[in-house]
Curated annotation (Swiss-Prot):
Keyword Transferase: yes
Broad EC category: transferase
Classification via InterPro entries: HemC, Porphobilin_deaminase_cofac_BS, Porphobilin_deaminase_N, Porphobilinogen_deaminase_C, Porphobilinogen_deaminase_C_sf
Cofactor: dipyrromethane
Cellular component, GO, one term: cytoplasm
Keywords of this entry: Porphyrin biosynthesis, Transferase
Reaction(s) catalysed by this chain's protein: 4 porphobilinogen + H2O = hydroxymethylbilane + 4 NH4(+)
Organism per entry: Alcanivorax borkumensis (strain ATCC 700651 / DSM 11573 / NCIMB 13689 / SK2)
Record-level Gene Ontology MF annotations: hydroxymethylbilane synthase activity
Protein name: Porphobilinogen deaminase
Pfam families: Porphobil_deam (PF01379), Porphobil_deamC (PF03900)
Cell division among keywords: no
Length: 310
C-alpha cells in the first residue's frame, strides 16, 4: 500500500470526534502501516447557536466546510452523521461508505419524568428538531416545545440547569458517548419516527479517488446502506431539507425492507404517514413510492407553507 497518511475532516464536537476516531481506529487496524490523522474544524453550524438551523442554511452547514477542507487538500475524507448529509452532494464528491448503524431511535431525557405521557400539563420540552417538535406536539398538544441547540453536553447542561423538564436527543449520540444512563426512555418509532439516516455514520471523499475508496470499502455495512438508501430516496423525492418535519425509518428483515415515512405540520396539528415493503435491492424505488403516498395526502402543501415561513 503506497499511502501512509490519511486525513479525516471532522467537526470538533465530542460526538463528531468520537465518530472520526471510530473510523480512524477501524482503518488503522485494517491497514497496517497506515497513519490516520484528524483535521478538526469548527463549522459555522457549531458556532451559531442562537439561531434555528433552518434560518442559517440548515444542517448542510455541518458538511460544507468539511468538503472545503477536502477540496483544498487539507483532508482526504470527511466523516458525517448521515442525518446531516444533504440529499444531493456537490459535484466532485462521493459518499462510498455508510458504517454500521447505532440505535436509530430518539431518546427521552429527563431528571424527573419517565416519558412524554408522564409530563405534567404545560411542561417544557427542548429539541432542535422540527421533526421531533411536530411529533411531540401531535402526542401532547399541551406541552411547550422550545428550541435547544448545541452539542450533547451543552444540551444536557441546559436540562440540568432547569431550563427544560425534558429534552429529546438521538439515542445513538448518548450511547456512543457512554451516556446510556441519561436515557430515561427510548422512544419507539410509533411515538417518534426517527430522522432519515439517524444513527448512521457516512464517509465522504473526492469523486474518483479510487485508492481512498478502496481503503474505505471494508467499513461499509450493506444492511445499513440498504436501509439508509431507502430513507434518503424518500426524502429526496419530497425535496426535504435537513430542517423540516420529515421522518423516515427503514427496517430490514429476511431480505425485505419495511419503510415508514412521515410529514407533519410544525405544531403537530396534521401528521401524514405512509409505509410499504420491497425487496432489499429496491430501496430507492420503495423510498419514492412512500414519498408519492405522502404527496398524495398533501405533504407538498405542508412543506411549501413551511419553506415560505422560514
Amino acid at each position: 500500500m503506497s499511502r501512509e497518511i490519511l486525513r479525516i475532516a471532522t467537526r470538533s464536537s465530542p460526538l463528531a470526534i468520537w465518530q472520526a476516531e471510530y473510523v480512524q481506529q477501524r482503518l488503522e487496524s485494517l491497514h497496517e502501516g497506515l497513519r490516520v490523522e484528524l483535521v478538526r474544524i469548527k463549522t459555522q453550524g457549531d458556532k451559531i447557536l442562537d439561531t434555528p438551523l433552518a434560518k442559517i442554511g440548515g444542517k448542510g452547514l455541518f458538511v460544507k466546510e468539511l468538503e472545503e477542507a477536502m477540496m483544498d487538500g487539507r483532508a482526504d475524507i470527511a466523516v458525517h452523521s448521515m442525518k446531516d448529509v444533504p440529499m444531493e452532494l456537490p459535484p466532485g464528491f462521493a459518499l462510498p461508505v455508510i458504517c454500521e448503524r447505532e440505535d436509530p431511535r430518539d431518546a427521552f431525557v429527563s431528571n424527573t419524568f419517565d416519558g412524554l405521557s408522564s409530563l405534567p400539563h404545560g411542561a417544557c420540552v427542548g429539541t432542535s428538531s422540527l421533526r421531533r417538535q411536530a411529533q411531540v406536539k401531535a402526542n401532547r398538544p399541551d406541552l411547550v416545545v422550545n428550541s435547544l441547540r448545541g452539542n450533547v453536553q451543552t444540551r444536557l447542561g441546559k436540562l440540568d440547569a432547569g431550563n427544560f423538564d425534558a429534552i429529546i436527543l438521538a439515542a445513538a449520540g448518548l450511547k456512543r458517548l457512554e451516556m446510556h444512563d441519561r436515557i430515561r426512555y427510548e422512544m419507539p418509532p410509533e411515538e417518534s419516527l426517527p430522522a432519515v439516516g439517524q444513527g448512521a455514520v457516512g464517509i465522504e471523499c473526492r469523486e474518483g479517488d479510487e485508492s481512498t475508496i478502496e481503503l474505505l470499502s471494508p467499513l461499509s455495512d450493506v444492511d445499513t446502506w440498504d436501509r439508509v438508501v431507502a430513507e434518503r430516496a424518500m426524502n429526496r423525492r419530497l425535496e426535504g431539507g435537513c430542517q423540516v418535519p420529515i421522518a423516515g425509518f427503514a427496517l430490514l428483515e429476511d431480505g425485505q425492507l419495511w419503510l415508514r415515512g412521515l410529514v407533519a405540520e410544525e405544531d403537530g396539528s396534521r401528521v401524514l404517514r405512509a409505509e410499504g415493503t420491497a425487496p432489499r435491492g429496491q430501496g430507492a424505488e420503495l423510498g419514492i413510492d412512500i414519498a408519492e403516498q405522502l404527496l398524495a395526502q398533501g405533504a407538498d402543501e405542508i412543506l411549501k407553507a413551511l419553506y415560505a415561513r422560514q
